[in-house]
Regions:
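Membrane-embedded alpha-helical bundles of multi-pass transporters/translocases
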Residues: 2-408
Length: 408
């Protein structure tokens, strides 16, 4: 098969690892540290936001470094994969030897830095692999993002699936993640090439490019709804729906639908163009997810249907936007490192923003993680933040995309 000769499955596996690292940080880790160690949601939100501000400086620097790696590139990237694995073990499998909030900050910093460096190099390598062929970028994105979404599915279900099987489900997940990370790094080893251009990219040139700048702004606005819903998902399922224990299966439904839909959106984009297909998917996302506002406690089945429908639409976001940006980088910044440093920055900033704004608002309404006796205003606040805010933000993203001319 052509895909095997091009080693595209290696990209699928590595993308699965990276996405599997991201889900625990944003969805499981805050609740785990709040439930297990009694850490304040406000403190966790503030710390996550502070770490993301650190990323504002870190990601462009890591992109700058990535474009200047030469002979040692393979070794440095592989060592970074070790850091990613060890940081996950530290976060979930080792009891904090210091104050839990500071241990959380230390291990998450290791995860953030390793994740950022690996992601930047991974997506930049995709730019050079696909070249300037528009169909090549969309095709690679389909393999890559399908792997990413499958990785999220596994990361979503394993911790809850291991309850009753493993003494410490999150520790078992962390050790399993570390092993898979090293396997994926082994298969990606031959893919890490030196930079494709002798002249490293200048970040100013990327920002000054009209199309690249518009895509970055669109990514920032469009990623925020998913950041909001991801941050509050566990709390919504447990406290609003009263469906504790269903978190893993529901997450799997959402991301599996996204993974299955990803090649379909990719094929549609090759035929009809990325922009009209993406607009269609975003409109369908609002139509499906908006129904969440009408749910009552016990409505697990209707919510499962919403997870499938909205997950299928998210597959377009996660496949087409990175492909559009990579296609532009192939023209103005062939090395890709600086560009995807910026891309990482805007996407991760939305998660930080969601944490620092939403978690304190939730706590001030009287919400206490794990409590079975919450005041009505806490449930109302949770519902509005989880269901209404993402829908409004998605409408803003749709308006922006419609009004934006992305073609040169």
């Amino acid at each position: 098969m052509k895909a095997l000769s091009e080693r595209l499955p290696a990209y699928t596996g590595f993308a699965a690892v990276l996405s599997g690292a991201g889900l625990p940080i944003y969805i499981y880790a805050p609740k785990y540290y709040a439930d297990t160690y009694g850490v304040s949601l406000t403190a966790l939100g503030a710390l996550l936001f502070g770490l993301r501000l650190f990323d504002v400086v870190q990601d462009p620097i890591l992109g700058w470094i990535s474009e200047r790696l030469t002979d040692a590139k393979k070794l440095i990237i592989t060592l970074t994969a070790f850091v990613l694995a060890l940081s996950m073990i530290g976060l979930f499998a080792i009891a904090p030897p210091i104050s839990p909030i500071w241990w959380f900050g230390l291990t998450v910093t290791g995860l953030f830095t390793a994740f950022s460096f690996l992601s930047i190099n991974f997506y930049a390598q995709g730019v050079s692999k696909a070249g300037k062929d528009p169909k090549g970028h969309v095709r690679l994105a389909a393999w890559r993002e399908s792997g990413a979404l499958l990785g999220v599915c596994v990361a979503a279900v394993i911790p809850t699936a291991l309850i009753g099987i493993a003494a410490d489900p999150f520790a078992a997940f962390a050790y399993g993640f570390a092993a898979v990370t090293l396997i994926a790094a082994f298969f990606m080893w031959p893919e890490w090439k030196e930079r494709v251009s002798n002249e490293p990219s200048q970040i100013g040139e990327i920002i000054r490019d009209s199309t690249a700048r518009k895509l970055l702004i669109l990514a920032l606005v469009n990623a925020t709804p998913l950041a909001v819903s991801s941050t509050l998902f566990l709390f919504y399922v447990e406290s609003k729906l009263g469906a504790a224990g269903w978190e893993g299966p529901l997450l799997v439904l959402f991301f599996l639908a996204a993974a299955v839909s990803s090649p379909i959106w990719s094929a549609l984009a090759r035929r009809y163009g990325e922009k009209p297909v993406l607009i269609t998917a975003m409109i369908l996302a609002v139509a499906s997810f908006g129904y969440t506002l009408t749910l009552s406690p016990g409505d697990v089945i209707p919510f499962a249907v919403i997870c499938v429908l909205s997950g299928a639409t998210i597959g377009a976001d996660l496949t087409l936007l990175p492909a559009m940006f990579a296609k532009r980088m192939a023209v103005i910044s062939p090395n890709g490192g600086q560009g995807f440093g910026l891309w990482n920055l805007v996407n991760k900033f939305t998660l930080a923003f969601a944490a620092v704004v939403l978690l304190p608002l939730l706590e001030r309404s009287g919400f206490v993680a794990g409590s079975t006796d919450l005041p009505p205003e806490a449930i109302t606040t949770l519902t509005m933040l989880y269901a209404l805010v993402p829908s409004l933000l998605k409408l803003l993203a749709i308006s922006l995309l419609i009004a934006t001319k992305l073609e040169d």
